[in-house]
Each structure stands twice: as C-alpha cells, then as structure tokens.
Amino acid sequence: MNDSTRGLLLVSSGIVVLSFDGLLVRLAQADGWSIVFWRGLLMFLALGAFSLSAKSRASLKAQPLISAASALLLAFTSIFFVLAVIHTTVANVVVVDSTAPLFAALFTRFILGESVALHTWLAIGVAALGIMIVFAGAFTATDLAGNGYALLSSAAVGANLTLLRRNPAIE
C-alpha cells in the first residue's frame, strides 16, 4: 500500500472514530476530570501494549525525550478535548478541532522552517475566519472557555504532528 492510500485510510478511520468521541463524552455524564482519568488510563494501556514491540522499544530507547514530549502532547490533546466538549457544543469542538492540520502547517513553517504551499495558506485563512465565527457565537464565558479548550486541543495535535514529522523514527 502506498503512503497516499495509507494516509487516506488513517485519516478516514480517525474521522469515523472521532465523530463519536464528543457524543461518548456527553453520554458518560461524569465530571470532566473523571473522564480524563479513564481516557488517560485506557490510552496508557493501549500505547503501553503497543510499545512492547521490539521496534517500539528501540524507538523509545533511541529518543526518550521526544517520545515523552509526544506522550505529553497526546495527554494535553485529550484533556483539552474533554474540557472543550463539557464546556461548549460538540459541533463547535469538531469545527475547531478540524484545524489541527493547519496548526501543523504553521508549526512546520515557523519551527522547522519548511515552506507551506499557497493553497495551505488560503485554507489557514478560511479556517481562521471559521474559528472567528465559532468564537463570535460564544455568548457565555463557558462557551468561550470550551472553544478555547478546543483550540488548545487542536494546537496540541498540530504540535505533536510537527514533532513526529521532525522525528520520523518515533513510533
């Protein structure tokens, strides 16, 4: 399978899984930190099981700080996502979270110094307008906080993507 097909399958799978994520957080009817705890524990167990493979252990030993930074960014992503869903509408969270690749493009440009295509800059501009519209509809402090958490979640995903792009040997 070529990289394009693999990437498309991964993105499509991620969209399907994440489309139910906000609903599941709402259905849990628990406080945010309880949900964060259980999500974190399950993520730790899943990633821990994955890291038992010889290739993953070698990757962890080769660059432990990068691996730890990636894990920390995943934790921030999860925490901010749950807090966002609790504080604002799932629709707002999904719209704002969809900007993660655009954050990755910005971080890649300004941190890694890579060039960004014109159509990506145009997409970033359109997404920024969309985020302004979402934030303009935040009539309460709680909505505004939720939208802010969603933006932080999206930025953490973008930062993690940039980190992994810089260090492709990390599993």
Language model regions located:
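Cytoplasmic-side transmembrane-helix entry/capping segments in multi-pass membrane proteins
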Residues: 7-11, 62-72, 114-128, 146-150, ...
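Hydrophobic transmembrane alpha-helices of multi-pass small-molecule transport proteins
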Residues: 47, 51, 74, 106, ...
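Helix-loop interface residues and adjacent transmembrane-helix termini in multi-pass membrane transporters
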Residues: 29-30, 87, 113-115, 169-170
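Structural signature of transmembrane alpha-helix termini at the membrane-water interface
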Residues: 20-23, 27, 45-56, 79, ...
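Specific alpha-helical transmembrane segments that line the substrate/conduction pathway
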Residues: 34-45, 82-113, 153
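Specific transmembrane alpha-helical segments of multi-pass solute transporters/efflux pumps
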Residues: 17, 48, 54-92, 96-97, ...
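Glycine-/small-residue-enriched transmembrane alpha-helix faces in small-molecule transporters
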Residues: 1-36, 72, 80, 139-166
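Helix-helix packing/entry segments at the starts of transmembrane helices
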Residues: 93-99, 164-171
